Amino acid sequence: MLRLFFTILVILLTLPSMGRGICDSDAVENNFKAGDVVMPLTLIGAGTLGFVEPLKNARYEVRDYLNEWRGDHRVTVDDYLQYVPLASIYGLSLLGAEAKHGYIDRTLEFATAYIALGAIVNSIKYTVREPRPDGSANNSFPSGHTATTFMGAELVRIEYGEDSPWYSVGAYTAAITVGALRVYNNRHWFTDIFAGAGVGILSARIGYWMLPYTRRLMHKITGCDAFIYPSMDSQGASLGLSLRF
């Protein structure tokens, strides 16, 4: 997660060489709606209930049941599936889906969301220091894998939900699967998954709420002298860069 976190910082620093899609307006719109925080905060709150009875005891019961049922079997697909919704933020538009924002705006949105996610997840993990159910480390709460994939799923919903609800369904199905596999693999308590999902959704919405401000900031840095555009042919997909002198 830390490597991807620093990659996002690099993207933010290199956007000035990419960017006209953010130069459309000097006006700052307001994307924030108070009701948008209800669901993610509810999920985070549900996750914290794992520290008190009766859910605290229920966590051990679920872990013990799964350990007996699963035996030594483990899967690793969750390590890769967590990134599918994130890749879809760009991949769906290359396949013809209509996104709400252009590539630059989506990158700003994603970068802001991931920075928020990294800050929230790591600050909680290393403050709470909850032991994992398998005893391997003291950073179980909240689930970082789940937060990452739910952030991606929510960004897919924001960007492509108006084009087709099935994009949202697919992304959230992948996210739920990742969360379930984290519990199956004995890497997280089930309440960690609730909290991780809430953090991921909240982070995605922070990226969306902040987009008018990050767009304006990048506009001031870059001016309006360049733009990027996607293209696709029989050889594959690519991004083009056009410069105006």
Which positions does each model-derived feature cover?
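Hydrophobic alpha-helical transmembrane segments of multi-pass membrane proteins
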Residues: R74-V77, T107, A111, S143
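Cytoplasmic juxtamembrane regions at transmembrane-helix boundaries
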Residues: A97-A111
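Generic short alpha-helical segment signal, independent of protein family or function
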Residues: P85-L92, G96, A116
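Structural signal for membrane-spanning alpha-helices in multi-pass inner-membrane proteins
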Residues: G47-G50, I89, S93, G179-R182, ...
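N-terminal transmembrane-helix/juxtamembrane module of multi-pass inner/ER membrane proteins
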Residues: R20-I89, K125-D134
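Alpha-helical transmembrane segments of multi-pass membrane proteins, especially transporters
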Residues: E109-Y114, A197
